[in-house]
Amino acid sequence: MNIRQAKNEIKHTVEAYLKKDEAGDYEIPEIRQRPVLLMGPPGIGKTQIMEQIARELGVGLVAYTITHHTRQSAVGLPFIREEEFAGKTYSVTEYTMSEIIASVYRRIRDSGQREGILFIDEINCVSETLAPTMLQFLQCKTFGNQKIPEGWVIVAAGNPPEYNKSVRDFDMVTLDRVRYMTVEADYRVWKEYARAQHISGAILSYLELRPGNFYRVEADVDGMQFVTARGWEDLSNLMAVYEKLGFLVDEQVIREYIHHADVAEDVAAYLDLYRKYQDDYGIPQILDGCVRPEIYARIYAAAFDERLSVVHLLLDGLAAFFGRAASERALTDAWYAFLKEYRRQVETCLLYTSDAADDLIGV
């Protein structure tokens, strides 16, 4: 499935797990609420869809990348306490609350959201000392001897072994206790997200011409070469700021985000061509309604790649115009609401002052 399908299925799962009957009990008992295990390549938006699901459902979200944790922070620190057994006192080992479980309780306390999603990323890339804890977590929904609070749905994500050398396979016993989903990179789905996030028109134009370069992972003698959706989005954000500052985005800069030599070189060449088209066609003048006659003849005779680039240049300019218009409208609406409330308060104050004056003179 693609990332959009995965989002919808996880969202449906959370809604089903949190559905209650007339008595206020969960329709699916907690013991039957299997954790969701989402496996897919890195950088395709697994964490982002969890944020979207939590926001759309109005539930809490606690997200952790488990590779950043040690066994002590995940399970808790040991301490000694005394207990009496059969008339004798013994020293026994107890554990402090898991940092992850404590974060869930803090979220409940601070937000008032008693239901939510506990998202654990890179769950199959943990260290050898933490691996048994993760198996216990998926099988029993506990960290150490502490359970996940009721009403919190577990979603875990990991990478297939071809993307990460430190991946550990789950055994059949664990897989039989989870909902296993496999997600793949899909440019058509990402393109919808990219438009909503105002990803650079130059990048979208390039990927329309080279969709095969959207997501690539290859191993050669020089090591791993890869391109991910995250890389395209982060590069786009940098390009937007560099353009405002007047800085050039060259091949060296692109290689810092696109870790594939051939693709980075190809993108750099295309960006140079994209900028040339912007100057040659006079895109700002076209958007102002001033089109030179020779422009029609040139675009008519142009190759498909050139036409597509010009279309994206025009769309980029329109998007910037619409963005400015939306910002100005939002600012106007905010000022209108402020002045309306200010006027109401002034009228209330004047009315109160008038009534007080009347009372004072006995009218």
Walk through the language-model features, giving the residues of each.
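AAA+ P-loop NTPase catalytic core and its hallmark functional loops
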Residues: M1-S205
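Conformational gate/switch positions in structured elements
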Residues: S91-T93, A229, D359
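Conserved AAA+ ATPase small/helical "lid" subdomain
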Residues: Q197-I254
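Extended alpha-helical coiled-coil/bundle linker/stalk regions that scaffold oligomerization
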Residues: R255-L351
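Conserved small/polar residues in nucleotide/adenosyl-binding loops
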Residues: Y352-D359
